[in-house]
């Protein structure tokens, strides 16, 4: 433990979550050091943000400062906030300090890491772009994820974000032998609780044998002080880095919601008395975002692929928070309410979702050509929808009618039964390889299945299943 005698200071001022502490001369903690007020369960951990001079430091609290008094003793731990890492974290829920909050006893982890760490050196990076196969047709074909890349997930309430996230967690464990870390940053406590319950129900978290779980959860919800919401993303990232660097695994890191990370930084910045920048955001917005995002990458040992839910304030994409986030993204997955209302799940919008990986020199000529064909067909269908609504399908030319028929089949074939939704849909989940997806869509667009009913393409895996389903429909 720390030699507390020489490292103890006292609180000189408390303003909400900001605590000023005076230390003896020559014993000042460094910036980002953790300092602790009190002992046991009632202790409050703060992180040093500024050295004020006159032997005083200004720190931001990670928990509520209720009950703290001036003159209370403060211990300098001499290190940043350190959190447990490794397999014992799987299936558990932690707070920003790495303390379990799921009432399942202490975490058995033997290793711990500080949340403030340098990004990997250039020499350690794996710079060759490679596609990260998810087994989800619409994602792999039309907006593929980069291994070690950053993906923005856009979608309103109730369009299937949570189910898509759980399926990705399930598939990375199934196909890549990887694990996931979920960072709940400044969102609703109820949503965090629902996600945990759904993960247990779908088998992503195995309560009987926690080591078999596929995900660790780190929550810093809306009711937490801004310091906790600002740092919870780093706690989740630190846990993910251990799986990448030490266990040499592919890791999925979910951050929900990246906007709340910026929002918390803005609150802390104002509390520390910094001059605000554009739209009232912190002047250090780009730096804070860069420090987090640069640690999310592929190394020669393993990869961290990050999926970040992005809340866009007032739907304004030019707002500094989403605009700064976009600069770091390699792909965007946009969920559409229109598709969800048609019952097409995953409700990923094939025309709005984008990826920097969709280039012939990266994915290959055949994949690229197939993706472009799908998009052209769906775009043409979208253009014809107004005419169909006014005049009806019969007024279209023969060629346009064929395009519409194929587009409707493509739209349905982009849907897929998920493993984690088996409980609700009754259909067994399907993992579809990229090669099977390309083959199926090529044959569909070439007209090979023009005589099959469109419902045979709905909620199936590969093209052979669609053919079998059509045979059953015709037999009836």
Curated annotation (Swiss-Prot):
Pfam families linked: ATP-synt_ab, ATP-synt_ab_N, ATP-synt_VA_C
Subcellular location(s) of the protein: Plastid, Chloroplast thylakoid membrane
EC number: 7.1.2.2
Keywords: ATP synthesis, ATP-binding, CF(1), Chloroplast, Hydrogen ion transport, Ion transport, Membrane, Nucleotide-binding, Plastid, Thylakoid, Translocase, Transport
UniProt-recorded Gene Ontology molecular function terms: ATP binding; ATP hydrolysis activity; proton-transporting ATP synthase activity, rotational mechanism
Membrane topology annotation: Peripheral membrane protein
GO cellular component terms listed in the entry, alphabetical order: chloroplast thylakoid membrane; mitochondrion; proton-transporting ATP synthase complex
Subunit field text: F-type ATPases have 2 components, CF(1) - the catalytic core - and CF(0) - the membrane proton channel. CF(1) has five subunits: alpha(3), beta(3), gamma(1), delta(1), epsilon(1). CF(0) has four main subunits: a(1), b(1), b'(1) and c(9-12).
Protein name, per record: ATP synthase subunit beta, chloroplastic
Native source species: Emiliania huxleyi (Coccolithophore)
